[in-house]
Amino acid sequence: MKLFLVLIILLFEVLTDGARLKKCFNNVTGYCRKKCKVGERYEIGCLSGKLCCINYEEEKEHVSFKKPHQHSGEKLSVQQDYIILPTVTIFTV
């Protein structure tokens, strides 16, 4: 009887975890689905082979990050704390 109760509890735990929608990636605010709903658009593919559907209204709330503008003619006069050395691997020999 105790084993039966444990199995029933575990069965409900598995079902509740599987019912949640999976998020696409950390930096994307979408969900993985087979088909996108109305008002959503397909951005990229998920690892499971489904579509990453992003809502238009949620996307408008998030402002895209822009890189600061650097002048191409100016050179930086700051010394670097490190030196980039060439690496040699088995494939380059």
From Swiss-Prot:
Cysteines paired by S-S bonds: C24-C52, C32-C46, C36-C53
Secretion signal, residue range per the UniProt entry: 1-18
Localization in the cell: Secreted
Main localization, broad class: secreted
A GO CC term attached to the entry: extracellular region
GO terms (BP aspect): defense response to Gram-negative bacterium; innate immune response
Keyword terms, alphabetized: Antibiotic, Antimicrobial, Defensin, Disulfide bond, Secreted, Signal
Family the entry assigns: Belongs to the beta-defensin family.
Function comment: Has antibacterial activity.
Protein name (Swiss-Prot/TrEMBL): Beta-defensin 128
Taxonomic source organism: Pongo pygmaeus (Bornean orangutan)
Encoding gene per record: DEFB128
